[in-house]
Amino acid sequence: MVRRVVATGTFDILHPGHVLYLCEARKHGDELWVIVARESTIKHKRKPLIPEEQRLFMVQSLKCVDHAVLGSETDMFEPIRQIQPEVIAIGFNQHWNENELKKQLAERGIKAEIVRIQTSDHSPYASSRTIRQKIKESDP
């Protein structure tokens, strides 16, 4: 049986921190599925600069990613229901509360182990926010 891992994110301004998160997530199974957030569903931070189809293309191009899909515009759990992962990998700085996520998954009959990826690249360029700020600062 193939052990599927799901990772999620916006992946706006793809950077080394994203790549590290996805490669570490891949180590928890045989197949890495990535759900790329849709612009219409992002509520907790600013809207992406890069259109969703281009973000999806960039994530699909990474060697450690086996499959990448856009998230649902109506139910964030729908792609997870379709993929049926054994593991859901959460990034070290993602806003999820693991216990709340487990509860929401259980309410939907989804059984998956939740793993928080602790590894991060401490480079100043491992944050989309920092990259945006550096671009603003360099603009004459």
From Swiss-Prot:
Give, as one word, the top-level EC class: transferase
This protein is called: FAD synthase
Subunit architecture: Homodimer.
Superkingdom of origin organism: Archaea
Q: What does this protein do?
A: Catalyzes the transfer of the AMP portion of ATP to flavin mononucleotide (FMN) to produce flavin adenine dinucleotide (FAD) coenzyme.
- Give me the reactions it catalyses: FMN + ATP + H(+) = FAD + diphosphate
Query: What Pfam families does the annotation carry?
Result: CTP_transf_like
InterPro entries, alphabetically?
Answer: Archaeal_FAD_synthase, Cyt_trans-like, FAD_synth_RibL, Rossmann-like_a/b/a_fold
Q: Which organism is it from?
A: Methanocella arvoryzae (strain DSM 22066 / NBRC 105507 / MRE50)
Query: What cofactor does its activity depend on?
Result: a divalent metal cation
